[in-house]
UniProtKB/Swiss-Prot annotation:
InterPro entries: DAO_C, DAO_C_sf, FAD-dep_OxRdtase, FAD/NAD-bd_sf, G3P_DH_FAD-dep. The gene is glpO. This is Alpha-glycerophosphate oxidase. It comes from Streptococcus pyogenes serotype M6 (strain ATCC BAA-946 / MGAS10394). PROSITE patterns: FAD_G3PDH_1 (PS00977). GO terms for cellular component: cytoplasm. Belongs to the FAD-dependent glycerol-3-phosphate dehydrogenase family. FAD binds at residues 21-49. GO terms for biological process: glycerol metabolic process; glycerol-3-phosphate catabolic process. It is found in: Cytoplasm. Residues 399-408 have a biased composition (Basic and acidic residues). The keyword Ribonucleoprotein does not apply. Its main location: cytoplasm.
Length: 612
């Protein structure tokens, strides 16, 4: 179904002509998940996003749909149980996006190690039980030092005890967002990017009845009326709530910044994802992940108080990550000049709760008795021999027996929060990408109840555990063969097998629509046929309005295909200019914006300082 600049114009027109059941502010993964379930359940739904979809936070993750073995470092068993079950749901509803990618976790004999070999084995067994993969080919494996080095010969050998391999999944975070958005559009949601909420409309009882917004493409003010409004703006959540709390600061959010760096795989060859202690005795771990022909690594996890829209990679971030990777992979000798791309993102964390861990945290010491009791209790619960209450009690005992230290950014709760202010504004904040569907479901249950009680409108919430996103109409048990069949179809449209396979994996069950564009399109000047199809599909069916939308979020050109990017810049801008009828000035503006983003990702300014 078309989802284009014209779709956007019509959506804004319709939003101003009706009283929506629900207006969603924020088009990251949280807002996209809410929009899909609301529209599919029959609510008259609108969504506005001040940037491109996923631009703020949801395209800047570590790009995993992980089960959270790391949460077992804090023995947050309930979080892991929820996360692995939700990961399985995401595999069902978006089978073309998460791909299994077993993770290698080396264990070193050094101060501050997260796991000993024994505790790693227990944690992995517990993880497998929670994930339902015990006694399957996906079950964990304990590796000797020699087996670890056979898999990753460039790892540091000194102090290496062995390691483990456990099931994890890579993700295309921005694609997961746009596929949810497209499905919501197909189901009738009115959706527009580059529209910024500026204030609330209030009735005489100071209850929200809509939003004053601004179309950032035309600078026009827009009035959108809605029975209910939900704030899903991630790091911006406090700012939106501030509209009606002028002079009274709201500090629910405590954003932290995460940085990832990308190098050519030849500079840092890894055959599989690696998750390893930093070696700095700081309680943290880093991922080193192969993607395309590149390797990326991260993340940092530091408190952030700067510009929410433009978090930057600093020299301190670069030095921290390069130091860790060069220590763990002694032959790499990476410098800042080896970095081809990068990204900095903000995690929309909730302040005041250190129960859950993201990247190590600082949870103090745990006695062996507490550890063993928790493991035994959880195993009994999984085998239906003990109650959930017993698990909760054991977890509380762990928490009280842990000497809690100063609140570390890495130990801020990744849990979600769903609140309603006195003016009626709902705010859904926090959480992890993996949990987006469950968060949306919880919010919609309440919203549907309020619509019934306060407005006399009845809706039945869809079963979102089986409701596929756009592109996800593939048998989850047969993903590889179905995508291969789509690729074969692409070759009949004149594409090479490699190009057809690339498009099939990118678009899933939408691939035939992409291939069908060959009936009206030929390869544009300077672009391959596959690139031309992908670009036009992005403009007409994915609301890509700017070159940065296409290069950074609809595709991974800017992150993991840097070698071929420069040759595509001018041809893509020329093709977009024809499509959108841009003036010469607009073309220049779009190219300048793209080159600024590329320079930021390339760390050109930091590299320039090194040369001075």
């Amino acid at each position: 179904m078309e989802f284009s600049k014209e779709t956007r114009r019509l959506a804004l027109q319709k939003m101003q002509e009706r009283d929506l059941d629900l207006l969603i502010i924020g088009g990251g993964i949280t807002g996209a998940g809410v929009a899909l379930q609301a529209a599919a359940s029959g609510l008259d739904t609108g969504l506005i996003e001040m940037q491109d979809f996923a631009e703020g936070t949801s395209s800047r993750s570590t790009k995993l749909v992980h089960g959270g073995l790391r949460y077992l470092k804090q023995f947050d068993v309930e979080v892991v149980s929820d996360t692995v079950s939700e990961r399985a749901v995401v595999q069902q509803i978006a089978p073309h996006i998460p791909k299994p990618d077993p993770m290698l976790l080396p264990v070193y004999d050094e101060p501050g190690s997260t796991f000993s070999m024994f505790r790693l084995k227990v944690a992995m067994d517990l993880y497998d039980l929670l994930a339902g993969v015990s006694n399957t080919p996906a079950a964990n494996k304990v590796l000797t030092k020699e087996e670890v080095l056979k898999r990753e010969p460039d790892l540091k050998q000194e102090g290496l005890l062995g390691g483990g391999v456990y099931l994890d999944f890579r993700n295309n975070d921005a694609r997961l967002v746009i596929e949810n958005i497209k499905r919501a559009n197909r189901d009738g949601a009115l959706i527009a990017s580059h529209v910024k909420a500026e204030d609330f409309l209030l009735d005489d009882k100071r209850q929200i009845i809509g939003v004053k917004a601004r179309d950032l493409l035309t600078d026009q003010e827009i009035i959108i009326k809605a029975k209910l409004v939900i704030n899903t703006t991630g790091p911006w959540s406090d700012e939106i709530r501030q509209f009606s709390h002028k002079g009274q600061p709201i500090h629910q959010m405590r954003p932290t910044k995460g940085v990832h760096l990308v190098v050519d795989r030849q500079k840092l060859p890894v055959s599989q994802p690696v998750y390893v202690d930093t070696g700095l005795n700081d309680g943290r771990m880093v991922f080193v992940l192969p993607r395309e022909e590149k390797t990326y690594f991260g993340t940092t996890d530091t408190d952030y108080t700067g510009d929410l829209q433009h978090p930057q990679v600093t020299q301190e971030d670069v030095d921290y990550l390069l130091g860790i990777v060069n220590n763990r992979f002694p032959n790499a000798n990476l410098t800042i000049n080896d970095i081809e791309s990068s990204w900095a993102g903000l995690r929309p964390l909730l302040s005041g709760n250190s129960a859950s861990d993201y990247n190590g945290g600082n949870s103090g010491k745990l006695s062996d008795d507490s550890f063993d009791h928790l493991i035994d209790t959880v195993k009994a619960y999984i085998n239906h021999e003990d109650s959930r209450e017993a698990v909760e009690k054991a977890i509380k005992q762990v928490e009280t027996s842990t000497s809690e230290k100063e609140l570390d950014p890495s130990a801020v709760s990744r849990g979600s929060s769903f609140e309603r202010d006195e003016n009626g504004l709902f705010t859904l904040a926090g959480g992890k990408i993996t949990d987006y569907r469950k968060m949306a479901e919880g919010a919609l249950k309440v919203i549907i109840q309020v619509l019934k009680e306060d407005f006399g409108k009845s809706f039945k919430l869809i079963n979102s555990t089986t409701y596929p996103v756009s592109g996800g109409e593939i048998n989850p048990a047969n993903v590889d063969s179905e995508l291969e069949a789509y690729a074969q179809l692409g070759t009949l449209s004149g594409l090479s097998m490699d190009d057809a396979r690339y498009l099939a994996n990118l678009y899933g069950s939408n691939a035939p629509k992409v291939f069908a564009l060959t009936r009206q399109l030929k390869a544009a000047e300077g672009l391959s046929l596959a690139e031309t199809l992908s670009l036009h599909y992005a403009m007409d069916y994915e609301m890509a309005l700017k070159p940065t939308d296409y290069f950074l979020r609809r595709t991974n050109h800017l992150l993991f295909m840097r070698d071929s990017l420069d040759a595509l810049i001018v041809p893509v801008i020329e093709e977009m200019a024809k499509h959108f009828d841009w003036s010469t000035d607009e073309k220049v503006k779009q190219e300048e914006e793209l080159r600024r983003v590329i320079a930021e990702n390339d760390l050109s300014a930091l590299k320039g300082q090194q040369e001075d």
